[in-house]
Amino acid sequence: MEIAGRRVAGVWAAIMSTILSKSEIDAQVRSLGVLVIDDSQYMRKIVRNLLLNVGVREVYEAGDGVSGLEAIRTLEPDIVILDYELPMLNGAELVRIVRSPDVFPLPHVPIIMLSSHADRTRVIEASQLGVNEYLVKPVSAKSLHDRIISILANPRPLVRVGDYYGPQPRRKFPDPIATPRIITEDTPAE
């Protein structure tokens, strides 16, 4: 494989061959069916318009967690965008049900959580539930498009660890109790 006039071999050739072109990404975005679950009709309209503006052609809507869960089951969307705070069944409860492969038929559907809460604990909780991406309202077309591209271009495998079923974490967090190791020139290699 050649990139910028240079021959690339081995691992780099494999990596570069998996990178999607802009036209391939645009085609994938156009083929998506996205379900928006939010109790605010105004917010659903905003997200729907943002999705249509970035090229998504099929946008479905649900106004609460229970109808959203049923819509996931029946419509089988490619991506779900849901509000954290929903009536009848909140976003966290909905994600727990969807990410239960023994109970729910589509545990693999990518989920983007929308919330007006930007605090770290809420983001961590959503991540621990199995959310693929987390966006804070108000959301821009660019940030929503970037998250969709992230899901399409860099899909993370689903893993089951204990009670968790969801996308593999992007990185491991260091153990806060572990003793830091100071490395100097004299430190022996492990």
Question: Over which residues does each language-model region extend?
Answer:
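Two-component/phosphorelay signaling modules centered on CheY-like receiver
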Residues: 41-60
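Acidic, metal-coordinating helix/loop segments flanking the phosphotransfer/catalytic sites
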Residues: 61-79
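Alpha4 helix (beta4-alpha4-beta5 surface) of REC/receiver domains from two-component response regulators
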Residues: 48, 93, 107, 118-133, ...
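Active-site residues of response regulator receiver
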Residues: 83, 115
